[in-house]
Regions:
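H-loop (His-switch) and adjacent beta-strand-loop-beta switch element
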Residues: 244-257
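ABC-family P-loop ATPase nucleotide-binding domain
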Residues: 1-43, 254-295
Length: 295
């Protein structure tokens, strides 16, 4: 695309169809691309008319990126993560993880793929209450028949990384909400995945605890050399990611935010007001700079 005037660069913008502007053929030959989504469509049958969540959605994620996905409730953000993790199948279109086409995987192959390549953190921790923190974290390793001593060593190390070394033998129900989410994060990383998917990982936490958990997530993203995609309604956290993508009307739109607080507030207002029908989304070629930090 062409150059932009200083007025174009001076204010935050929302990039319409940012992923459509990428060259699909170039991405296929780019070794830095970890995840590629092409012309994704997802619909559900509801009566006579289908409910279409996505149609022609495209996404390219490169290794090491930390991406936030924002959008109004019901836009399909959680469904998109399910498709990226092969927990669900698209109605049309393709999802590629490195050189693997997820559409060819059987249910068993998809389960193995998730166990080895994907770490998943939900808003609800889904820990097994009758097991200790150590046992919960070791579960993905035990599921693939790794010997218990080895699995427990790795689980203990992850719990140390998330600051819960003193709580390894506590039952899940004996932990606070923040501690439970830390255990969930340790469980997601114990298999050394390349991709971390987090669906509202701080949504059930108070502000102080949410900030601590998100800071931990940032640090682990760096130390474990992860590629991370987070769904969040928290714009302050989204701004700390390398890219922010807004899911709106079945497409992803890149949101570019300046570091200036006044301009970021203006951008948040644009995003909020753009939920109204007919709101124009401005196209610009300026990408977001990498703002991923460590805590």
């Amino acid at each position: 695309m062409g150059g932009h005037s200083s007025s174009d660069v001076a204010s935050p913008r929302i990039v319409e169809g940012a992923e459509d502007a990428r060259s699909a053929s170039a991405d296929r030959d780019d070794d830095s691309v970890l995840l590629r989504v092409e012309n994704l469509r997802k619909e559900y049958r509801s009566g006579l008319q289908p409910l279409v969540l996505f149609d022609g959605l495209n996404l390219t994620v490169r290794q090491g990126e930390m991406i936030a996905i924002v959008g109004e409730s019901g836009a399909g953000k959680s469904t998109l993560l399910h498709l990226l993790a092969a927990l669900d199948r698209p109605s049309a279109g393709d999802v590629y993880f490195a050189s693997t086409w997820l559409g060819k995987l059987t249910a068993g192959e998809a389960a193995t793929f998730r166990n080895r390549e994907i770490g998943y953190v939900w808003q609800l921790h889904y820990l097994l209450p009758e097991f200790t923190a150590l046992e919960n974290v070791a579960m993905p390793l035990l599921a693939r028949e790794e010997p218990k001593p080895s699995a427990f060593v790795k689980a203990r190390e992850l719990l140390r990384e998330v600051g819960l070394e003193a709580r390894v033998n506590h039952l899940a129900g004996e932990l606070s909400g923040g501690e439970q989410q830390r255990v969930s994060l340790a469980r997601a990383l114990v298999t050394q995945p390349r991709l971390l998917l987090a669906d509202e990982p701080t949504g059930n936490l108070d502000n102080r605890t949410a900030e601590a958990v998100f800071g931990l997530l940032e640090r682990l993203h760096t130390t474990h050399r992860l590629t991370s995609i987070l769904v969040t309604h928290n714009m302050a956290m989204a701004k700390r990611c390398g890219r922010t993508l807004r899911l709106h009307e079945g497409r992803l739109h890149e949101v570019w935010l300046h570091s200036s607080e006044s301009e970021e507030a203006s951008a948040e207002g644009r995003i909020a007001s753009s939920d109204a029908p007919g709101h124009p989304i401005v196209r610009t070629a300026v990408p977001g700079a990498n703002r991923t930090g460590t805590a």
